[in-house]
Amino acid sequence: MDLVKQAEWNKELPKTWDELFDLAQKINSLNGKSGVYFGETDTWLILALSLERGGKLINEKGKVDFNNKAWQETFKLLSDFHTLAKMPAIKRSEAISSFYAGNLGILIQTSAALTQTEKSINFPLKLSKFPGVQSGGELPVGGSVVMLTNDKNKEAALKYIHFVTGEANAYVPQYTGYMTSNLLANAKLKDFYNKNPNYTIAPSQIELMGNWPSFPGDNALKATNTLWNYAEKLLMGTSTNYEEIAKQAQEEINALLP
């Protein structure tokens, strides 16, 4: 929050992307400081930009369609990080180090990094909800699938699964920042949440949580990497033509899908 105060942002943290870019620009004006970094090298944050607008990853034909309002706005927003917010063209690891050092004002990344971040900084940290979620929009969240056979050798694994998904799940937010997936465990975290308000941000958005969609077929990972590679062109400023980038990404990804 030190850079936010230095930038004379004397109001609530941004609730929209326009407000976030405005704050980023103010921080950019401080000597040697950067405003914002879109901090993941996976596609879930990119998906969040579309899903919060009601977008879908795969259409009814099993293909991607980036030529619609939600996805066009998403690709433009990715470009805006470079053109408007002047996001530094650096690696994620460098951005995290910059944030730890107090030289980066806003870092957009997974809540799983919260505990480590708190241990690594010497300034007040405040989390904010994901900006710009529109009516009917969702945010993608992760999940796990457990599959066991009747093999007796799996007994120990099953006991462990019962443990980590039960009341012990209360340790998950305390040691990572992730939201617990167990409502009973969550109820027991009241005192922890009162003392650590940053950890309430993730569960406070539970009504917005939706599926984390993936690409179909054997080339799902290649398609995922392709989407990120095109998004990175906009984030890093290699290209500012978001419409052409969206078109190229759609063509290349659909060629990979069944």
Labelled PLM ranges:
Residues 1-12, 21, 38-60, 139-147, ...:
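Periplasmic solute-binding protein
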Residues 7, 80-84, 118-181, 212, ...:
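Extracytoplasmic/periplasmic substrate-recognition and gating elements
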Residues 30-34, 101-109, 123:
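Alpha-to-beta junction loops
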Residues 20, 27, 50, 98-106:
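Hydrophobic residues within well-ordered alpha-helices
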Residues 15-22, 88-101:
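Short helix-initiation/N-cap motifs at beta->coil->alpha
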Residues 21-26, 61-89:
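Glycine-centered hinge/linker elements that transmit conformational signals in sensory
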Residues 42, 92, 109-114, 203:
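Beta->alpha turn/N-cap motifs
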Residues 175-229, 233:
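Long, aromatic- and glycine/proline-rich binding clefts that accommodate carbohydrate-like moieties
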